[in-house]
């Protein structure tokens, strides 16, 4: 496939940059970039059978790559059709956009753009939908909501055993105003084939007031506990990470900052104390993968607490080193809240790691 890709490049880009890519896709980019994001690209509409090596080979032909990741489904391992590339040189990133944007690969026309920084107009555009007919497909749900704006991602939650829809879904729009219009138009309405009205509301992100309270607590805690040369850097990491969680802000620091045990320690006061690490009790058990070796239980409390009642968290540690083995478990009492947490945190970037979050199955690691 690599040979075919390079051949396609030669035939398509000889006359200059290709035309615009298709208008809809899983994630967003921007035609411009801030000084801190001129090396980080998002690539949409990749062929599903494209491998990580082929993805790296394609973009590595432009210049030196710091990192690249083809995003895959956490369960099936199949490509989700998009990925991220971070170049060493901003000029190479710009060249990749001019050279590869609009490149046709198999039946796809790829879109290459700068990873879009957050802004008020695009934040919090994720909707939670309940009461959907069990027979409604993801495509039908998208058709229902597409009249209100551009849909970025959609998902219908299914039973892990039977594969049957739970009647709960998520829709992420391009802009918040589109999500607001969808709520006005569809909340309380009966779609075709529905016996009951559906509920459409914003996914349960922490409110601005809650976020501000967290920030205040965090700064007070850090001021008491840390001083010296590390204080400012640690404080900045905490602020960035908390903003990322509370407001959906994806600032450059969160993309490159290493996961710091010092920073996490400062968050422990926000999550409560007296955590026990035994087996999960009654409720919905969530599997969290790709945690840092330095991660502890306070990380999981801090991540999942804003979505609802958490009864237990557990980080699985190596017996010899006492370091996190890369995964842990969270138990939440309410299914809808657990589902919202999964939909919001799966793919969440924590430090340099992208978390994989799903309902626990028998195939996954056991505590």
UniProtKB/Swiss-Prot annotation:
An annotated GO BP: nervous system development
GO CC list: ribonucleoprotein complex
Superkingdom of the organism of origin: Eukaryota
Pfam families: RRM_1
Keywords on record: Developmental protein, Differentiation, Neurogenesis, Repeat, RNA-binding
UniProt-listed SMART domains: RRM (SM00360), RRM_1 (SM00361)
Domain RRM per the UniProt entry, residue ranges: 39-117, 125-205, 284-362
CDD domains in the cross-refs: RRM1_HuC, RRM2_HuC, RRM3_HuC
Family: Belongs to the RRM elav family.
Protein name per Swiss-Prot or TrEMBL: ELAV-like protein 3
Organism field: Homo sapiens (Human)
Gene designation per UniProt: ELAVL3
């Amino acid at each position: 496939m690599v040979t075919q890709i390079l051949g396609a490049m030669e035939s398509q880009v000889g006359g200059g940059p290709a035309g615009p890519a298709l208008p809809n896709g899983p994630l967003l980019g921007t035609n411009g970039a801030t000084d801190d994001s001129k090396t980080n690209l998002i690539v949409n509409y990749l062929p599903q059978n494209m491998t990580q090596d082929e993805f790296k080979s394609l973009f590595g032909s432009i210049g030196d790559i710091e990192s690249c990741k083809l995003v895959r489904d956490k369960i099936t391992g199949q490509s989700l059709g998009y990925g991220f590339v971070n170049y060493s040189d901003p000029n190479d990133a710009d060249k990749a956009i001019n050279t590869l944007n609009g490149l046709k690969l198999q039946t796809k026309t790829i879109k290459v753009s700068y990873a879009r920084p957050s802004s008020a107009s695009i934040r919090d555009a994720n909707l939670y939908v309940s009461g959907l007919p069990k027979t409604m497909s993801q495509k039908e749900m998208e058709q229902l909501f597409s009249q209100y704006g551009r849909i970025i991602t959609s998902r219908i939650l299914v039973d892990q055993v039977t594969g049957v829809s739970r009647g709960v879904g998520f829709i992420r729009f391009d802009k918040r105003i589109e999500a607001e219009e969808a709520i006005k138009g569809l909340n309380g309405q009966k779609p075709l084939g529905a016996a009951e009205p559906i509920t459409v509301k914003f996914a349960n992100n922490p409110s601005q007031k809650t976020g501000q309270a967290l920030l205040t607590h965090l700064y007070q805690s850090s001021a008491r506990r840390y001083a010296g040369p590390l204080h400012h850097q640690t404080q900045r990491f905490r602020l960035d990470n908390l903003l990322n969680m509370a407001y959906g802000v994806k600032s450059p620091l969160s993309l490159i900052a290493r996961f710091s045990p010092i920073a996490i320690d400062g968050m422990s006061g926000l999550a409560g104390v007296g955590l026990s690490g035994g087996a999960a009790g009654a409720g919905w058990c969530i599997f969290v993968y790709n945690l840092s070796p330095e991660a502890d239980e306070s990380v999981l409390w801090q991540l999942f607490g804003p979505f609802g009642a958490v009864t237990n968290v557990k980080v699985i540690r190596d017996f010899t080193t006492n370091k996190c083995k890369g995964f842990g478990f969270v138990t939440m009492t309410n299914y809808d809240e657990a589902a919202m947490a999964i939909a919001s945190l799966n793919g969440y970037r924590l430090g340099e790691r992208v978390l994989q979050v799903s309902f626990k199955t028998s195939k996954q690691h056991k505590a």
